[in-house]
Amino acid sequence: MSGRVLVVDDNKVIRQLIRVNLELEGFEVVTAADGAECLEVVHRVSPDLVTLDVMMPRLDGLRTAARLRSDPRTSGLPVAIISACTQYEVETGLAAGVDAFLAKPFEPAELIRVVRQLLLHREAPPSADGSREPGRAGSSRG
């Protein structure tokens, strides 16, 4: 499986760690340093998936996810939060339409599993009611 992933994190080391792990699995990776930069590049790079940190300058991950969901061009784009999230942030993320959560620190294999699951879910036909089920990719088995 391949695809283009937009990795958004203000920590350069974390961006590189995620990039290397995804590239080793055959994914193309584009990075952004915060939510504002993500919104600037998302239409130009047309990713298949976006990963977001929560705590970032200018525009945090939860507000970025909400903006991606409110834009018709990115409303169906899978979004995963990769962060040390509180329960409140998880609930807020689910309300904003985040598809999966991965807690920092994470195992590389878990990162790959979440990304693959979200991409498979995106390619799958919609459910009978035509909806996606947010949050399931981070917790279901595939």
Describe each region flagged by the PLM.
Residues 16-24:
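Charged docking surfaces used in two-component/phosphorelay signaling
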Residues 26-33, 41:
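Short hydrophobic/Thr-rich beta-strand motif most characteristic of the beta2 strand and flanking loop
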Residues 106-116, 123:
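C-terminal output helix
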Residues 32-36, 108:
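Conserved Asp/Asn-Gly motif in the active-site loop of CheY-like receiver
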Residues 45-51:
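Active-site beta3 strand of CheY-like receiver
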Residues 56, 79:
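Receiver (REC) domain active-site loop signature in two-component systems and cognate sites
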